[in-house]
């Protein structure tokens, strides 16, 4: 529930990619025999080179693993179990055409899925994208450059000679809504974005830095504001290719002037709650929209944070 106070509020909903819909069954990652035993009846998620999957009627389309091979290939990653205990694996492979013409299947990447997916599908696609992206770029050890091979059912890679094991890298980043504690919030437009497209301020956490310190530093660097009372809201995996977005809100002073020193931000402005509500009512980002303010798509934690603040009274 959203707090009615303008100074503090909570997320009204869990971001799509943060929802839990499948059992990760992580114990099976170290018991490859047990994981492989479920292969004959397992489901297979194909993710192509453009990180697209097949989706129909709000669900990701899963094939039969046994049609790919009689056992899990080395490059397959184990995603867990869905309802009924069925195992699900993912591979980087071309998408298979659907034989049934009555199934309205389309190839969509994770950014374009929006709210068309159920919780289980979003979790499976998010995990598969993150893991497969990592495997694509981690075939050699970060320690000594030696070739590595998949282990733990795709959740790590090992140097077969030394036994050195490496795990998927995650890059934490903060994302923050700056508001005045009353009726206004800051939204900014990156230099690479079209006119009217605004979102929250975000940036990667540096070595030796806390999330809260990162929030203050990034906002100061990007728009020149000094913020205080930084408060945590929630988090969301963002596998593009390997980020974890950690959401906050913080107080800022509308009388302080903006400054843009690092070149990332083209403009920033204070928007009233009514202006944001009107933009939300107009829908997701779209250059064809007639809205004066275009906001992030529904898949992002930025959208959920903005919606939650806008709902405050």
UniProtKB/Swiss-Prot annotation:
InterPro entries: NAD-cap_RNA_hydrolase_NudC (IPR050241), NADH_PPase-like_N (IPR015375), NudC-like_C (IPR049734), NUDIX_hydrolase-like_dom_sf (IPR015797), NUDIX_hydrolase_CS (IPR020084), NUDIX_hydrolase_dom (IPR000086), RNA_Hydrolase_NudC (IPR022925), Znr_NADH_PPase (IPR015376). A divalent metal cation 2 binds at residue 218. CDD domains: NUDIX_NADH_pyrophosphatase_Nudt13. Residues 168-293 form the Nudix hydrolase domain. Substrate binds at residues 111, 236-243. It comes from the Bacteria. It holds the Pfam family NUDIX. Its cofactor is Mg(2+); Mn(2+). A divalent metal cation 3 binds at residues 218, 222, 264. A divalent metal cation 1 binds at residues 202, 222, 264. GO terms for molecular function: magnesium ion binding; manganese ion binding; NAD+ diphosphatase activity; NADH pyrophosphatase activity; RNA NAD-cap (NMN-forming) hydrolase activity. Its EC number is 3.6.1.-, 3.6.1.22. Divalent metal cations. Mg(2+) or Mn(2+). PANTHER family: NAD-CAPPED RNA HYDROLASE NUDT12 (PTHR42904:SF6), NUDIX HYDROLASE, NUDC SUBFAMILY (PTHR42904). NCBIfam families: PRK00241.1. mRNA decapping enzyme that specifically removes the nicotinamide adenine dinucleotide (NAD) cap from a subset of mRNAs by hydrolyzing the diphosphate linkage to produce nicotinamide mononucleotide (NMN) and 5' monophosphate mRNA. The NAD-cap is present at the 5'-end of some mRNAs and stabilizes RNA against 5'-processing. Has preference for mRNAs with a 5'-end purine. Catalyzes the hydrolysis of a broad range of dinucleotide pyrophosphates. This is NAD-capped RNA hydrolase NudC. The gene is nudC.
